[in-house]
Every structure is written in structure tokens, then in C-alpha cells.
């Protein structure tokens, strides 16, 4: 998870205006940033591929006030963007009093850096200047600095005028008087030896901004005090906190504030809070006005009266089963994403809407029953449910795969062998191997185990089109039988189906074939279907297929 996030950040950072060094003095790289004022910045060493050379800087780096270049003397005024990115052998950087600016991600992912002192004349520290510094234990600001401080030896950088804690480390003691904990302030800090740590957030803090403690994997305890008003998006995502008490002064909790907290077992909202509650000892955060369950934990029970299971409410929470009371009407986006649900999942008919990714990656679900009453199922609602074998959908279903140009409701469910929907549904039909939209006779979702037979059953139930991504990620599909009624296969319809050995076409007129309709993206078969499967076409149509766009690329083609 951390690696993926760091890669995403790096991709963003590389779009910033950072460049290789103009010159080097005593092992430190510099760029000239102003000839007129004779100013330069510390920068990174660029390797032959044009990227930052890792571990170029080692031990303690001393940056001087001035350096000589081309017979001229330059003041060192800036620590440049990515200057010390991924310098794992770096222990400390001693910065001179001439430094005015520390740029975006100047110090990021330096695993062994232990101490940083901000000089007195620094007036600007850009966002993400200090991130993922897991060994950092000493963080201070020179007492003469008029913009920033590290009051009371707190081991943090605080913007003095706004009382905003901008950057912290694992030894930070958040001092009373701080009013805001900034975005990414403690992002991915980690102790050595996997020792847990905790934070006591004083009552002066009114706002904890987004990602403030995100991915602090070994943060096991947080104490919130009365006075706190707002908790931002992903604020405590990916931490190891085991319990949380929400003060009665809290007025706003963004979705996913406590997302992906796998060890969380106890949630309580203090009585007297006017916006949120944890009614009936449910071990959850509920938005009182909307009856929306916002955040759950492994011991949550959904109480009667809850109308909405909120976005990411159970995201990666280890729950084996869930009981949805009769009051629940909506399950929102990613509500149970990656949760530990096991066995048969029954979604009662009082649930009218199931959002995108609602049960994605619930690998323990082996049977799905959506009861009569449900009307909408979002795209990827049951994607990557890798144990799912049977799915039953209701006659009340009106909208399937909502929210994406790709339907992908069951993509990656590679053991799925049967999808059923009652004949009386006016919008969709099923032949067991696929769900077909009646109005367009388009396959919107299909099964992936063994032979997929779209050519069987009533002729008026056979499809004319296969939609984008309809069979996406069906790893165990070995053969596809296409009906004589088929007119078009859209792009990526059979994307990442590596086991297909042959395709049997029923139509003498080659259907239109979309771009990348059958590319495999990983494994030994990193080839389009045209390169490796046998295409079987009706007698007398071989020449037509050999000259048709897309079909002509099949290397192995025979007539029946």
C-alpha cells in the first residue's frame, strides 16, 4: 500500500519544475536560480536515466552559506524539490542561515534521517517537504524564526501565525495552542522495530485535515479532546488504532476518516454530540440526521433505523457476516470493499441501491442472493469476489452496472458459473451464462468458469452485442460460443481471460470487433486472443472472417 502511494506521489512530483544540477561543490549538487541576485538551490544528482540517483547523499550533509561557481560566489537560498528524495544513507542535513525556502518533497522517503533543524530565515516550507521519514526523532525550528516554531520542544514544525502543525514525527508531542493539524502532517511516519506509538491531541485542536495521520501503520492509540470540530478525509486511514472516542464538539467527519483501520474494535460517540451518534452501542459512527452509518469496525452491529451504509464504512474491516436490518435502503460506494465477509451473502429487498465497488474484493463470498426490491446495482459492485460461484438477481432490478462506461459488475469473479434473473424482469434476461439487457440484447455480464455458451436457449434471448468488459478478468474461461445473432463485440469484452483456447462463431457475417477486445495483461499469455486461440467459423465464411477488421488478425482459423 505504501509503495503504491509513494509511486503515485513521485509521479506527481516529477511534473514539478525540478532539474538536474548545474554544478557540484564538496559532494553537494546545486542549480543556479538567479544570476542577477547570485542565488542557487541544493538539488539532486541525476543518474543516466534522467531520474534521481538514490543514496547519492550519505551520513551528514553540511550545506554552506555560499558556493563558488564559474568564478562567481552564489548564496544558497533554497533546498530544491526532491533534493534529498530517497536518500536512505542520509542521517542529517545541516542547513545554513541563508536558506529561505524548502520546496515540495525536498525530504521524502529518507529512511534513516534522524534530525532536521529549520534555520531562522526560512519563510516558506512547501507542502510535502517532509514525508515518510521513519527514523526522524528530532525536528526543530531555530528560535529566531518569525514564521515557524517548534514551541515547548514539541519535535514538530508549527506555522506560528495560524497555529497550524505542518509536519511532525513519531516523537512529536502536540502542544496545547495548536489549532490545526495540517494535511499529511504525519503521513507514513513509522517507528523502528515496529514499536507502536500514540498521540494525545489537545483540546485546542479544532481541525484535523485530510491524510493528517494516514498510513501511520504503527499508530495504535489516539486521544481526541473536547474542542475538536472537524476530522478530514482519510485522516486516520491505515493506522492501527484499536479504539476511538469522538468528542461531543465534533461537527464534521469526512467519509473514510478512519478507513482501513483493521484493528479498530471500539467506536463511541460521546452523548451530547448534535451531529453524530453511536446508538444502541453499535460500535460505529452514525450521522444522526440521515441515519447513515459512516464508520464501522470489526465489532459493529448495524442497528435498526439505519437507512444508509456509507461510503467505505466497512472498508477492509474483518467482519465474517453482516445482518442488514429492514430499515437499510442504500449501500454506498465501497461500503464493504475488501471486508472479510464469508459464505452466502443475502441482500434483503429493502435495499434499493447497491453502489459501485460495494462488495469488491470480498474474496470469501461464495454465493450471492439479491432479493426482490433491489433496483440498482453499481459497476464493479461484486468485482474480484474470487470465491463467488452463483449469483441470483431479482426481477425488480432496473439498472445494472451504473456509474461506468464498463459494466464490470462481476469482473474478476473467475469461479462464477451461474447468474440467474427471473424471466419476469422487464429489463434483463439470463441464460445462466450471462445477463442480457433486453432493450439492446447486449450481454452486460457473464460467467467465467469453463465454456461460456451464448448460443443456447431461445433464439429471441440470444444477444446481438457483447458490452465493454462484459467478461473482464474471467481467468478460467476456456471456450466461448457466440450465437448467430451476434453483431458486435465491444472493446475489452474479453479482457484478461488468459485460459481461452477457442472461440466458436455462429454468424456467417463477422461481428464488428472492438479495440483490444481480448488482451491479456499479465502472465505467460501476454498476447491478444488473435495470437493464440483457435477461431472456429461457420462453413463457407472463412474468407469473410479473414478479410474482416480484427478477425483477420487471428492466426489460427478453421471452418466447422
What are these model-predicted stretches?
Residues 4-14:
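Sec-dependent N-terminal signal peptides
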Residues 18-22, 27:
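Boundary at the C-terminal end of the N-terminal hydrophobic targeting segment
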Residues 35-37, 50-78, 87-101, 110-124, ...:
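Structural signature of tandem-repeat unit edges
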Residues 41-43:
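Non-globular, low-complexity intrinsically disordered regions
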Residues 81-82, 103-106, 127-129, 184-185, ...:
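Consensus positions within tandem repeat domains that build extended binding/scaffold surfaces
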Residues 131, 495, 516-522:
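A structural signal for leucine-rich repeat
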Residues 549-553:
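Helix-loop-beta element that forms the nucleotide-linked donor phosphate-binding surface
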Amino acid at each position: 500500500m505504501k509503495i503504491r502511494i509513494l509511486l503515485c506521489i513521485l509521479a506527481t512530483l516529477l511534473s514539478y519544475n525540478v532539474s538536474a544540477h548545474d554544478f557540484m561543490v564538496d559532494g553537494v549538487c546545486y542549480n543556479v536560480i538567479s544570476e542577477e541576485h547570485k542565488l542557487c538551490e541544493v538539488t539532486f544528482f541525476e543518474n543516466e536515466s534522467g531520474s534521481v540517483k538514490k543514496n547519492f547523499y550519505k551520513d551528514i550533509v553540511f550545506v554552506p552559506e555560499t558556493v563558488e561557481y564559474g568564478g562567481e560566489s552564489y548564496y544558497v537560498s533554497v533546498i530544491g524539490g526532491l533534493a534529498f528524495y530517497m536518500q536512505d544513507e542520509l542521517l542529517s542535513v545541516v542547513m545554513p542561515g541563508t536558506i529561505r525556502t524548502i520546496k515540495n518533497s525536498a525530504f521524502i522517503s529518507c529512511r534513516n534521517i534522524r534530525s532536521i533543524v529549520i534555520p531562522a530565515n526560512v519563510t516558506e516550507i512547501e507542502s510535502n517537504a517532509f514525508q515518510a521519514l521513519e527514523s526522524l526523532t528530532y525536528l526543530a525550528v531555530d528560535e529566531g524564526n518569525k514564521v515557524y516554531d517548534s514551541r515547548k520542544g514539541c519535535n514538530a514544525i508549527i506555522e506560528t501565525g495560524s497555529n497550524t502543525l505542518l509536519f511532525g514525527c513519531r516523537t512529536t508531542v502536540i502542544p496545547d495552542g495548536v489549532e490545526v493539524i495540517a494535511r499529511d502532517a504525519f503521513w507514513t511516519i513509522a517507528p523502528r522495530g515496529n514499536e507502536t506509538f500514540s498521540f494525545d491531541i489537545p483540546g485546542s485542536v479544532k481541525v484535523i485535515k485530510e491524510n493528517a495521520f494516514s498510513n501511520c501503520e504503527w499508530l495504535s492509540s489516539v486521544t481526541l479532546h473536547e474542542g475538536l470540530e472537524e476530522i478530514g478525509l482519510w485522516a486516520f486511514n491505515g493506522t492501527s488504532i484499536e479504539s476511538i472516542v469522538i468528542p461531543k464538539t465534533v461537527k464534521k467527519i469526512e467519509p473514510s476518516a478512519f478507513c482501513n483501520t483493521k484493528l479498530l474494535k471500539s467506536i463511541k460517540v460521546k452523548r451530547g454530540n448534535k451531529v453524530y451518534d453511536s446508538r444502541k452501542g453499535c460500535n460505529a459512527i452514525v450521522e444522526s440526521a440521515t441515519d447513515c452509518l459512516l464508520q464501522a469496525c470489526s465489532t459493529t452491529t448495524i442497528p435498526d433505523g439505519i437507512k444508509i451504509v456509507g461510503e467505505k464504512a466497512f472498508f477492509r474491516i474483518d467482519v465474517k457476516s453482516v445482518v442488514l436490518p429492514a430499515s437499510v435502503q442504500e449501500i454506498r460506494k465501497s461500503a464493504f470493499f475488501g471486508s472479510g465477509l464469508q459464505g452466502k451473502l443475502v441482500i434483503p429487498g429493502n435495499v434499493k441501491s447497491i453502489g459501485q465497488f460495494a462488495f469488491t474484493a470480498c474474496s470469501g463470498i461464495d454465493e450471492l442472493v439479491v432479493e426482490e426490491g433491489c433496483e440498482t446495482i453499481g459497476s464493479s459492485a461484486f468485482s474480484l469476489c474470487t470465491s463467488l460461484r452463483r449469483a441470483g438477481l431479482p426481477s425488480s432490478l432496473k439498472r445494472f452496472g451504473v456509474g461506468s462506461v464498463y459494466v464490470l459488475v462481476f469482473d474478476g469473479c473467475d469461479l462464477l458459473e451461474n447468474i440467474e434473473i427471473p424471466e419476469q424482469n422487464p429489463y434483463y434476461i439470463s441464460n445462466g451464462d450471462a445477463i442480457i439487457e433486453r432493450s439492446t440484447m447486449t450481454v452486460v455480464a457473464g460467467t467465467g468458469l469453463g465454456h461460456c455458451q451464448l448460443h443456447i436457449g431461445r433464439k429471441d434471448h440470444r444477444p446481438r452485442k457483447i458490452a465493454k468488459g462484459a467478461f473482464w478478468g474471467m481467468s478460467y474461461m476456456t471456450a466461448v460460443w457466440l450465437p448467430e445473432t451476434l453483431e458486435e463485440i465491444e472493446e475489452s469484452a474479453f479482457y484478461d481471460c488468459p485460459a481461452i483456447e477457442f472461440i466458436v462463431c455462429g454468424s456467417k457475417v463477422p461481428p464488428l470487433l472492438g479495440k483490444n477486445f481480448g488482451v491479456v495483461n499479465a502472465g505467460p499469455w501476454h498476447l491478444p486472443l488473435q495470437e493464440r486461440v483457435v477461431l472456429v467459423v461457420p462453413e463457407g465464411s472463412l474468407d469473410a472472417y479473414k478479410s474482416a477488421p480484427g478477425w483477420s488478425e487471428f492466426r489460427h482459423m478453421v471452418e466447422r
